[in-house]
């Protein structure tokens, strides 16, 4: 945002450069991985548009309507939707361990976001967009799990970014977007965000879905606010509060619970 990009433009840049990077990687490894059956496009419309673009749009609208803390907390209702959908679609069991891990994760996110530390108002609009962002976030796990029955992790990730870029660019004022990219600092930043914050996590998460239940994977992904809190403390000098410590412990506890159940 320091370079003048709006939140939606940042999303468009992320997926656009991620698509370019993924294409380069696949051409290097095996160009045949770019081949898909076009009747399977609905899978990638699901991961790219109904999930990636939709949840980002709703997430930013939720922030505009309330606060970052509320938006983040509602976004991380995603594991609930993943687990509910997985019961019907993949016949995954909703065990006591999963329920405990889910509660521990949600409570941990509540403490880390500091939602109770200040006076905040939750409007119906903010709640609606926040909950929608959680549903959109959850859909990536569902559509990816379905796509993994037919396609390689690299293929799924690449086509997710292709379809996301097609949907996001028209909404991101492309003329202004590419004008701002003339700044070398903005270009380097966009490439870094695409590689570190988009390609790497989506590749790893999609690969993880091959070996882990969608519900478990969605809970493990809630490490994100914990990592964000740690970066804020150690790099940006944010205060380490009792609430944050408790939140981190709760999120780590959910991973311990899932690991214990697996063993």
What is each model feature region?
Residues 4-5, 66, 92-94, 151-152, ...:
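Membrane-helix interface residues
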Residues 8-25, 46, 101-107, 125-132, ...:
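Hydrophobic alpha-helical transmembrane segments of multi-pass integral membrane proteins
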Residues 9, 70, 93-98, 155, ...:
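Residue-level recognition of membrane-helix boundary sites in multi-pass small-molecule transporters
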Residues 12-13, 52, 56, 70-77, ...:
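Helix-helix packing/entry segments at the starts of transmembrane helices
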Residues 22, 85, 94-115, 168, ...:
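Hydrophobic transmembrane alpha-helices of multi-pass small-molecule transport proteins
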Residues 23-69, 111, 194-212:
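Specific transmembrane alpha-helical segments of multi-pass solute transporters/efflux pumps
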């Amino acid at each position: 945002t320091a370079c003048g990009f709006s939140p939606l433009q940042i999303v468009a840049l992320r997926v656009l450069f991620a698509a370019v990077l993924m294409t380069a990687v696949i051409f290097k490894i095996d160009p045949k991985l770019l081949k898909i059956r076009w009747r399977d496009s609905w899978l990638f419309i699901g991961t790219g548009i109904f999930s990636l673009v939709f949840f980002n749009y709703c997430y930013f609208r939720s922030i505009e309507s309330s606060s970052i803390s509320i938006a983040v907390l509602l976004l991380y209702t995603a594991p609930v939707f993943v687990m509910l959908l997985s019961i019907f679609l993949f016949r995954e069991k909703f065990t006591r361990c999963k329920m405990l891990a889910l509660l521990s994760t949600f409570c941990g996110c509540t403490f880390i976001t500091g939602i109770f530390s200040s006076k905040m108002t939750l409007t119906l609009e903010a709640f609606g967009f926040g909950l929608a962002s959680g549903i959109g976030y959850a859909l990536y796990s569902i559509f990816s799990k379905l796509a993994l029955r037919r396609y390689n992790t690299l293929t799924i990730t690449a086509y997710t970014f292709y379809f996301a870029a097609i949907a996001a660019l028209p909404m991101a004022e492309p003329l202004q977007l590419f004008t701002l990219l003339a700044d070398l600092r903005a270009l380097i930043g966009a490439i870094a965000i695409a590689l570190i914050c988009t390609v790497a996590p989506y590749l790893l998460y999609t690969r993880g879905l091959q070996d882990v239940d969608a519900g478990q994977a969605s809970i493990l992904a809630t490490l994100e606010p914990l990592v964000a809190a740690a970066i804020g403390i150690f790099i940006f000098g944010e205060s380490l509060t009792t609430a944050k410590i408790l939140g981190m412990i709760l999120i780590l506890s959910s991973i311990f619970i899932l690991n214990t159940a697996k063993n």
